[in-house]
């Protein structure tokens, strides 16, 4: 297998460095907004990657239709982008006219893997999404509030506290993603070693 990160020696790579995870939500004013990106938050500044993430066909998936696929995959420049869309409860006041009755937030989880590792994408995406939904469903709306508070020029004590709470949630989600990736790749390697 080729090293997906050519400047990093393969033997020094951690399992969570094999993939990139993007957690986003749809904001009625700003569009597709990242909540977190791991392992490298600086990808927010990469216009090419963020353009791809924001136009991924997962955003057009109707998840209320039970016959829809569970996920949508996209291949681009040597990587596979596996994506899942789900809804979480929200108490956030919506800013678009006519959206006051919406009590849910649209969340998109995208997992990027090198194309020669795409066999692992579906299972890993499922594990990460199940764990985020199980452990963070009520907290994701707080994370969204924190991200919106960061955008505001004037930071009130309430918005500063919201940002602080959001950062703590974000760090916990990142730890969950890292642990899930490590555990998953270690279990896959053990299974492969046992059958070799």
Labelled PLM ranges:
Residues 2-19, 29-196:
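Acidic, low-complexity cytosolic segments
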Residues 24-26:
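Solvent-exposed interaction surfaces and binding hotspots enriched for charged
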């Amino acid at each position: 297998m080729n090293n997906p990160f050519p400047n990093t020696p393969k033997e020094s790579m951690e399992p969570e460095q094999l993939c990139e995870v993007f957690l986003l939500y749809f904001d009625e004013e700003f569009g597709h907004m990242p909540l977190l990106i791991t392992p490298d938050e600086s990808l927010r500044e990469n216009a090419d990657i963020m353009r791809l993430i924001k136009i991924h066909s997962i955003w057009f998936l109707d998840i209320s239709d039970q016959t829809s696929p569970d996920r949508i995959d996209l291949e681009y420049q040597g990587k596979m982008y596996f994506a899942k869309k789900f809804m979480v409860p929200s108490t956030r006041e919506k800013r678009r006219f006519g959206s006051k009755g919406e009590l849910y937030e649209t969340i998109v989880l995208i997992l990027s893997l090198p194309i020669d590792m795409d066999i692992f994408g579906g299972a890993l995406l499922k594990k990460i999404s199940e764990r985020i939904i199980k452990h963070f469903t009520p907290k994701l709306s707080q994370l969204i509030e924190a991200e919106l508070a960061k955008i505001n020029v004037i930071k009130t004590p309430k918005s500063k506290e919201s940002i602080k709470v959001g950062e703590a949630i974000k760090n916990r989600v990142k730890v969950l993603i890292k642990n899930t990736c490590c555990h998953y790749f270690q279990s896959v390697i053990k299974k492969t070693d046992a059958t070799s």
